[in-house]
Regions:
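N-terminal "assembly arms/tails" that initiate or stabilize quaternary assembly
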Residues: 1-89, 258, 317-337
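Protruding loop/beta-arch "assembly-hinge" segments enriched in small, turn-prone residues
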Residues: 1-26, 245, 251, 259-266, ...
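Short alpha-helical segments and helix-capping/turn motifs at coil-helix boundaries
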Residues: 35-43, 173-175, 266-269
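Long, contiguous amphipathic alpha-helices that act as assembly "spine/axial" helices in icosahedral shell
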Residues: 56, 83-149, 181-190, 194-195, ...
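Short helix/loop capping segments that flank catalytic or ligand/cofactor-binding pockets
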Residues: 64-67, 108, 198-201, 207-208, ...
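Alpha-helical scaffold segments that mediate packing/assembly in large oligomeric complexes
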Residues: 104-178, 312-314, 319-328, 332-337
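Extended, solvent-exposed, turn-rich assembly/linker loops in the middle of proteins
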Residues: 143-221
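Extended serine/threonine-enriched, polar tracts that run as long, contiguous segments within proteins
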Residues: 192-196, 202-204, 211-282
Length: 337
């Protein structure tokens, strides 16, 4: 039987609310449209409803195989053994609860909690997932062996010039330096609003309308050098030196990050506390999910608890390469604009 409750005299069914949350994707539409997040059934099946750490297989590329043999009727066609690798993944579990004093409703006739349940929970979780994704990207880029995936144009002294800002060729040059001839696979550009404004002024950032197979509709999205632009001021600037802000702009490739949700017990529920403050209604939410950058392993033994914090995701010491760095489709430009 569904666990139920009351919010502002509104009958709450946790199962129905869960279905509603699943229908209202908690992943940003821009992230979905870019295709950087790839649902991975292997990850989903490996973690399933139990466990939070798993080793999942990576199938090695054959790009560097020797040339095909000459079929001359004499040469033996000796098979090359296919090899695979594994990368370690770890689910991140998050929870958040809200409460409302019923006295507030008594005075105003309005229910903030009801409004939150109907309108704000989905945007909240979209923002949280986006922050975890950016933290993961930051950690990966600082890992040993990923040095060529970062270009630093910034300065923290003297004066800021155009050379310290992103220009027409900046993303092209970084893409080539990071992954060589695979640079055309970059599909998402995450940047601060100051960087986006700079690109707009140069007419390098423009709105493009097209049909998105992922979203199933026509969309108009900002794009720069063929990449969809996600503009966010969170996690994209180091303002330690106010006169020389350093902006981090991230490039992510299509299908670069495997993802899957992990089953959690009672993801949504309500409770009425008769005792506290003359009565309080509470809404509880939980989510668990995996962001697994292909080609990288998280060092699960370095994670203190059973779920990595955002700071632990950001820490490069908690990540290591599981393949050639060129198969990690993540890169970063540091600039002053």
């Amino acid at each position: 039987m569904a666990r139920t409750g009351i919010i502002n005299n509104f009958y709450f069914d946790a199962e129905v609310f869960t279905d509603y949350m699943q229908e209202q994707s908690t992943i940003n539409d821009i992230l979905l449209a870019s295709g950087v997040l790839q649902y991975d059934p292997i990850i989903a099946n490996t973690l399933g409803s139990s466990g939070n750490v798993a080793a999942v297989p990576m199938f090695a590329s054959i790009d560097n195989e020797e040339d095909a043999l000459n079929d001359d009727g004499k040469t033996n066609n000796v098979p090359t053994e296919l090899k695979g690798k594994k990368m370690l993944i770890m689910a991140m579990a998050r929870m958040k609860a809200w409460k409302e004093k019923t006295y507030t409703r008594y005075l105003t006739g309005k229910s903030p909690l009801h409004n939150l349940a109907n309108n704000l929970v989905v945007p909240y979780w979209k923002a949280q997932r986006q922050l975890d994704l950016i933290a993961t990207i930051q950690g990966v880029l600082g890992a040993e062996g990923m040095e060529t995936h970062v270009t630093d144009l910034s300065t923290t002294s003297g004066s800021i010039t155009e050379a310290n800002k992103i220009a027409l060729t900046s993303t092209i040059d970084l893409g080539q330096k990071a992954v060589g001839d695979r640079r055309g696979n970059f599909s998402l550009f995450i940047c601060h609003s100051a960087v986006a404004a700079n690109l707009r002024k140069q007419e390098l950032l423009q709105n493009v309308t097209y049909y998105s197979d992922v979203l199933g509709k026509d969309v108009t999205l900002p794009m720069v050098n063929g990449m969809i632009c996600l503009e966010t001021d969170t996690g994209t600037v180091d303002a330690t030196n106010a006169n020389f802000p350093v902006y981090s702009s991230y490039m992510v490739g299509r299908g670069a990050i495997g993802t899957a949700d992990k089953l959690v017990h009672a993801p949504y529920g309500v409770e009425f506390d008769h005792e506290s403050n003359g009565g309080e209604e509470k809404l509880y939410t939980k989510q668990a999910y995996v962001y697994a950058p292909y080609g990288m392993s998280i060092k699960a033994t370095e994670i203190v608890e059973e779920s990595p914090t955002r700071d632990e995701l950001k820490n490069p010491a908690n990540w290591e390469l599981a393949s050639d760095h060129k198969f990690v489709m993540i890169a970063c430009i540091k600039s002053n604009g």
